[in-house]
């Protein structure tokens, strides 16, 4: 039975009453409806609930701890104090493509602000609107897993979905540019390599990601490099082996290097990332928890477990079915993993693009290994457990960025909480 047939059967089983129950449940308790939807995550009605909960969750974003997660505060202030007309946006687009000195680094954020403030001055509307493109591409990517005939209602499949989404989860919409770019890049990359012949459509999708976040000017040549190396699988696996030590290299070692020996444009970029202020903000997380060494050990464990993934996957490279359906993506994954390992010492940049690797890791584990071998799924969950705990339970991003009544109040109450607000 083909994947499409399986999907059709699943959708046909959904009747009017199932839709009515889930939507009514959502009105009464959005988070409860979200949890219930996970029971049948592949269904159309469940995807509708995922989408609606994502929008209402982002509408409800509001800083609860002003000393942490200043991305949300900064974006809110930008939304509140920025005012763009249609003419302003058009001029920014022209300046951007003319490479003018005063052109914005990217266009996406200002466009979102313009659209949002065309309807209301409420900054919460900005996050609700920003959630829409994020959710479209995240859920389209997720559907590439749930539409597979192997996907079932087991705990292993739910763990795979979690590992797939967690690197760039819904809370990251607090700064929507990079996280939206990630899911566009992930979706377009997977679909590009799924095609029998390489697709211009999906390449263009990757090519427009720098308009969303300027950091994707790094990903675009990286992607093209992967295409150039597609006929050299042995080279890519050797690059991965060579890159492994770099994945453990710390800022403390590399910050002592003399970057002035590099070409001017590279030295300026490196010194910017390596200066003490940048390190304190993004690496030490000053003002946060003092369990520094616990976090470092947990990071080493997580890095090690993820490094096992390509080694497990590589064993299946000569399997005829794997080679036919996933061979091109597997080789690209090995290549991009190696390339990003080489820049792990760079604060922010290395971590940002490692999120794409982690998402692809979960996808390929499901497509290539599951269900014949399930232990790697558990290892990954254990390797990520400390960071899941810190993010969702120990004063992390969720409790600092979203009032916790989003998890127990009904939908009308959550909407009214920030109705008519013009500040934070």
Language-model segments: residues:
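Alpha-helical transmembrane segments and terminal signal-anchor/GPI-anchor hydrophobic tails
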Residues: 69-88, 218-351, 396-424
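Short hydrophobic/aromatic helix or loop-helix immediately within or flanking a transmembrane segment
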Residues: 73-78, 89-121
